[in-house]
């Protein structure tokens, strides 16, 4: 496997030419010029030819994007839906699995995304219980403990694969094997995974998987994708419907028999054109090569951070993603983010709300987070470390 041409990636990314050091793809990544061009081209077509008329060309691009997403996830194109955000995708699938009732059990990892937990509130009000799967000694969700929790009342197993507050990689495939063995629906929040590391929905044994377009896929904001296993569609009854998701037939309005039952007829073809280009770029580069590069860069950053007095890392697990969570003694994480931003170095910062169960369990009020892209280079790392040393002093 040949390494990525990092210089070419940087030259094809306007943000890398602007003087910004971007260590925040876990929030949103820098798009390529080609992705920007795809968005602008569709908008220009709408302005020139008429929005509805240009929609025919846009629809072709959306189907091209759907095939690219299927290729990336090892899924049929018909199993892919596009939505406006990852949280929207997850919430729609969760609500469609209802109705929820008293006694239903929802098993989640301790690192669950806060937005997903918020979407469960309606089920909780109906009498369902959200229960946390115990972690193993490394801090990862434990498949053995999960297996011991299973009974006839478990209606959903839900896992955030790569948490937003650290480098943990949860054992998504092993969790999926437990779910499959017991015949329990299994949802994966892969918002931090898709575009960063290889994702094979067949190997994961998941029924639903979602990801935002703006993170490691390097697509535009306002886009997301969702995989729905074809054989699982019959168990999902979306509350929100329109003429696309439930088209008119001689017998009345009928839900589609593919993942597009979760789409709406009103979409931004321009944004989806950009997402489509980003998906094609990920496929061309090869996510295995992207992941190899991310592992190399993040290992160097972790090593450098450990050498700075006053910095504490918050990694769990044995293998780590390209997200490095840390704190610098004497600094609020959000103020640290702001001060680095003044030096044109972008990082992230999280409070409790994004991953409340894990943050509370570890007594963390906030964390600073550095996340990496394949286009980050040695100069980026040097700038980050030098700035942190300067602020510490």
Report each predicted region and the residues it spans.
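Pyridoxal 5′-phosphate
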Residues: 1-393
């Amino acid at each position: 496997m040949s390494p990525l041409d990092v210089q070419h990636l940087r030259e094809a990314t306007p943000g890398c030419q602007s003087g910004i050091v971007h260590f925040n793809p876990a929030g949103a990544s820098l798009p390529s010029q080609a992705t920007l061009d795809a968005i602008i081209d569709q908008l220009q077509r709408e302005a020139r030819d008429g929005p509805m008329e240009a929609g025919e060309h846009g629809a072709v691009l959306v189907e091209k994007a759907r095939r690219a997403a299927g290729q990336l996830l090892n899924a049929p194109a018909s199993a892919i839906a596009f939505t406006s955000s990852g949280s929207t995708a997850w919430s729609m699938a969760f609500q469609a699995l209802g109705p929820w009732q008293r006694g239903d059990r929802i098993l989640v990892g301790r690192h669950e995304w806060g937005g997903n937990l918020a979407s469960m509130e309606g089920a909780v009000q109906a009498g369902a219980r959200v229960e946390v799967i115990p972690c193993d000694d490394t801090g990862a969700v434990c498949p053995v403990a999960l297996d011991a929790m299973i009974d006839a009342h478990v209606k959903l197993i839900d896992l955030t694969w790569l948490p937003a507050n650290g480098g943990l990689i949860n054992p998504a495939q092993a969790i999926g094997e437990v779910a499959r063995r017991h015949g329990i629906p299994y949802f994966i929040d892969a918002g931090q995974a898709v575009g960063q590391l290889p994702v094979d929905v067949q190997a994961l044994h998941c029924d639903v998987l979602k990801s935002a377009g703006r993170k490691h896929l390097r697509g535009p904001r306002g886009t997301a994708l969702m995989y729905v296993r074809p054989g699982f569609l019959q168990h999902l009854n979306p509350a929100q419907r329109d003429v696309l998701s439930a088209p008119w037939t001689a017998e009345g309005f009928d839900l589609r028999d593919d993942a597009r039952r979760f789409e709406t007829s009103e979409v931004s073809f321009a944004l989806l054109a950009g997402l489509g280009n980003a998906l094609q770029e990920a496929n061309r580069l090869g996510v295995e090569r992207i992941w190899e590069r991310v592992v190399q860069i993040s290992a160097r950053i972790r090593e450098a951070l450990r050498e700075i007095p006053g910095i504490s890392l918050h990694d769990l697990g044995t293998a780590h993603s390209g997200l490095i969570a840390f704190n610098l003694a004497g600094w609020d994480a959000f103020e640290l983010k702001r001060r680095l931003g003044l030096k044109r170095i972008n990082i992230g910062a999280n409070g409790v709300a994004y991953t409340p169960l894990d943050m509370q369990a570890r007594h963390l009020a906030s964390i600073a987070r550095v996340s990496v892209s394949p286009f980050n280079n040695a100069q980026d790392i040097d700038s980050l470390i030098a700035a942190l040393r300067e602020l510490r002093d």
